[in-house]
Swiss-Prot record:
InterPro entries given in the database record: CBR-like (IPR001834), Cbr1-like_FAD-bd_dom (IPR008333), FAD-bd_FR_type (IPR017927), Flavoprot_Pyr_Nucl_cyt_Rdtase (IPR001709), FNR_nucleotide-bd (IPR039261), OxRdtase_FAD/NAD-bd (IPR001433), Riboflavin_synthase-like_b-brl (IPR017938)
Full protein name: NADH-cytochrome b5 reductase 2
GO biological process: ergosterol biosynthetic process
CC annotations in GO: mitochondrial outer membrane
Molecular functions (GO terms): cytochrome-b5 reductase activity, acting on NAD(P)H
Record's catalysed reaction(s): 2 Fe(III)-[cytochrome b5] + NADH = 2 Fe(II)-[cytochrome b5] + NAD(+) + H(+)
Keywords tagged on the record: FAD, Flavoprotein, Membrane, Mitochondrion, Mitochondrion outer membrane, NAD, Oxidoreductase, Transmembrane, Transmembrane helix
């Protein structure tokens, strides 16, 4: 039985890493059920909208009702054929637009040091305008400071979501922006600008991609994964290696587990912890050369891409850091030692 079929746990770490590493290649996958749906997408999307709408009517006015309402909007967008963002109004258009003020609507505590912040877009029928593998800039000016603090963040909401933009923010001890965002309460506003294009993704651009992430570096990876698996025409295979300090530091773990369970033959995830609990059966310590050599697609496979995103120390060890947002810098570290070329690696 396939490893992917046999394991349906929330964490890939439920199976010992030694067992996981026995399988490097994916089995040939037949056309997915989604690819066979064809015109049923409209029917199912409309049905989803109707169900979500019924839930909203029943819940009327409660916090859960707001989430149901968002599902109605998103399902309706899908039922309408998922219009491209060029065909709907975009909140962030880049260029000469300048900064846009967004109101914080909702705050969700994710774990001991991370929050999900939902900001309302200027109009309810707008999409953010942030495409796959893109980011935004955030800005605020501390009291008595001469200059504002500006930091990039990758939104985690679907690019087709209407009326809102979500940021997943980890608070760092000496991080002025992350501290400011964690201190915000609903009703306050944040200046944002974008989108900032990173990697120009298109369906089936690569046959297999590998994602090496650390901490909040998972956000652009998740954005990319969701776009791939939400598109029935995109048959890209994905391998994720995700490093964190402790188990409760693993961000988006439920969402990643759902993607893995729904796409067991095209998506596998490996988790590594610096400070694992006693019951942990996944990787321990740092992301190592042996681990990457075992689970990543081989560099001799031409139609692959390895994406890397994480704290500076991890980036330095895995691929070398970027010189600037527009300069990828020299390829160094483990990936170079394993034989990957600069053209096969992208640093977020």
């Amino acid at each position: 039985m396939s490893l992917f079929v046999a394991s349906r746990s929330a964490f890939r770490a439920a199976a010992p890493l030694k067992r996981q590493f026995q399988i490097r290649r994916y089995a040939t996958e037949p056309p997915s059920a989604d690819a066979k749906k064809g015109n049923n997408t409209l029917l199912y999307g409309a049905a989803a909208a109707a169900v979500a709408g019924a839930g909203y009517y029943f819940l009327g006015g409660t916090p859960a009702a707001k989430k149901a309402e968002e599902k109605v909007k998103d399902a309706s967008s899908a039922a309408a054929g998922k219009l491209s963002t060029s065909e709907v109004k975009q909140a962030l258009t880049g260029g000469e637009q300048g900064w846009v003020s967004l109101k914080l609507e909702e705050v969700e505590i994710v774990n001991h040091n991370s929050k999900r912040l939902r900001f309302r877009l200027p109009e309810d029928d707008m999409v953010s305008g942030v495409h796959v593998a893109s980011a935004i800039l955030t800005k605020f000016k501390p009291v008595d400071a001469e200059k504002p603090v500006i930091r990039p963040y990758t939104p985690t909401n679907d690019e087709d979501a209407r009326g809102y933009l979500d940021l997943l923010v980890k608070k760092y001890p000496n991080g002025p922006m992350s501290t400011h965002l964690h201190d915000m309460v609903p009703g306050q506003r944040l200046d944002v600008k974008g989108p900032l294009p990173k990697y120009p993704w298109t369906a089936n651009k690569h046959g297999h991609i590998a994602l090496v992430a650390g901490g909040t570096g998972i956000t652009p990876m998740f954005q990319l994964c969701r776009a791939i698996f939400n598109n029935p025409d995109d048959q890209t295979k994905v391998t994720l290696v995700f490093g964190n300090v402790r188990e409760d530091d693993i961000l988006l773990k439920k969402e990643l587990a759902a993607l893995e369970n729904n796409n067991p033959r095209r998506f596998r995830a490996f988790y590594v912890l610096d400070d694992p609990p006693k019951h942990w059966t996944g990787g321990k310590g740092f992301i190592t050369k042996d681990l990457l050599k075992t689970v990543l697609p081989e560099p001799k496979d031409e139609n692959i891409k390895v994406f890397v995103c994480g704290p500076p120390g991890m980036m330095d060890a895995i691929s070398g850091n970027k010189k600037s947002p527009k300069d990828q810098g020299e390829l160094k570290g483990i990936l170079k030692e394993l034989g990957y070329s600069p053209e096969q690696v992208y640093k977020f």
